[in-house]
Amino acid sequence: MRIVLGEIFGLKIYSYGFMIGLGIICATLLFLKRGTQRGYNEDKLFNATILTVISGILGGKILYIITEWKTVMQDPSLIFRDFGNGFVIYGAIIGGALGIALCSLKNKWNVLELADLVVPGLALAQGFGRIGCLLAGCCYGAETTSSIGIIFPADSLAPAGVPLYPTQIFSSIFDFALGLFLLWYGNKNKEKGKTMSMYMIIYSIGRFFVEFLRNDPRGSVGLLSTSQFISIFILIGGILLYNINKLKGRKETGEK
């Protein structure tokens, strides 16, 4: 567990940013492969990826600022001084979703089909990101006396010297498993929006429950953490999306 992996030409390589970057690369390659297999133009898909990544990063940073408003107001330079850290994943997802919607509108793509192509890679990227969380010590769990507890070093972002629930490991395993499941499910079910809805349903449920084991400062809405509060709406949206054709009384089977 280490915040800084090393230096290249005097530039520090942060473990969190490195794993996020690795996840984005893997997600992009998977998205391009699946998209071209469906007949999409590779250059347009790559441009869409750039926009989606940028909007996702901005969304993650904006929600971080909102949830940590008091801390940011005390030291606004945190926003720019440590831009590689301090992100909220739900903000990144929402920002990325807006990017996908804009790309779909511009290229006259079906937004649900494009989202179906994105989410398997997104889940896998989240898995890499949680490894980054483990290395940096952020998103840590509550204290535990169980044998599964992990102890972070003194230079970690997590409290040192006490066993904590390995919430980063739980989340990483969950995200990787979800990504593999979505790849399998997307190949079996080509109905537009189904893979996206499964991501929304499964991820929101998993995220809601793992939040009970976390103990890092991350904002709250009443008795719920910010992520638990958002998870409720993501879950409802996923259920509605999954049943959208039933609600409309018809099944969409048209080609893009």
UniProtKB/Swiss-Prot annotation:
Pathway as given in its UniProt record: Protein modification; lipoprotein biosynthesis (diacylglyceryl transfer)
Subcellular location: Cell membrane
Gene Ontology molecular function terms on file: phosphatidylglycerol-prolipoprotein diacylglyceryl transferase activity
Topology class, membrane: Multi-pass membrane protein
InterPro entries: Lgt
One Pfam family it belongs to: LGT
Biological-process GO terms, alphabetical: lipoprotein biosynthetic process
Swiss-Prot/TrEMBL keywords: Cell membrane, Membrane, Transferase, Transmembrane, Transmembrane helix
Binding sites annotated in the UniProt record for a 1,2-diacyl-sn-glycero-3-phospho-(1'-sn-glycerol): 130
EC number: 2.5.1.145
Coiled-coil boundaries: none
Major place of residence: membrane
Gene Ontology annotations for the cellular component aspect, listed alphabetically: plasma membrane
Transmembrane segments: 11-31, 46-66, 83-103, 142-162, 164-184, 221-241
Stated role: Catalyzes the transfer of the diacylglyceryl group from phosphatidylglycerol to the sulfhydryl group of the N-terminal cysteine of a prolipoprotein, the first step in the formation of mature lipoproteins.
Family named by the database record: Belongs to the Lgt family.
Name the record gives this protein: Phosphatidylglycerol--prolipoprotein diacylglyceryl transferase 2
Gene transcribed to yield this protein: lgt2
